[in-house]
Amino acid sequence: MTTIPEMIHARFAIDTARGTGITASETIECVLSRRAVRRYKDEEVQEGLVDVLLACAQSAPTKSNLQQYSIIIVRDPIVKSKLQELCPKTDWLASSPVFLVFCADMRRNQRISEFRGYEHANNNLDTFLNATVDAAL
């Protein structure tokens, strides 16, 4: 069994006594062993799986639970190549089967307010910053 100090060492390459004697829960183990893999199988991601993963992402808490972002699903190889050109050090992007772009979306809550018959009074820098943070989460 891997200990928390061993997991911290593997993650950050530092020796520490933090977590000594504490049993790692599945959540702690999952978070500390997380890593990014940017090698992809040469196959499409099932549409239903993308929908489920997006539902999970949109279930994460955000500022006031407003979900002030929109998600653009990119599958087109030409569009992915153009995005790769705009983003340095993303050689992996064009080879990804699907690429998700999270965008701060102030217009989303404006439209919800209009739909429900309310005035959208928070059209200001604070709303922009909240939307940006929501997209980044």
Annotate each predicted stretch with a short phrase.
Residues M1-L137:
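Acidic, surface-exposed loops and disordered segments
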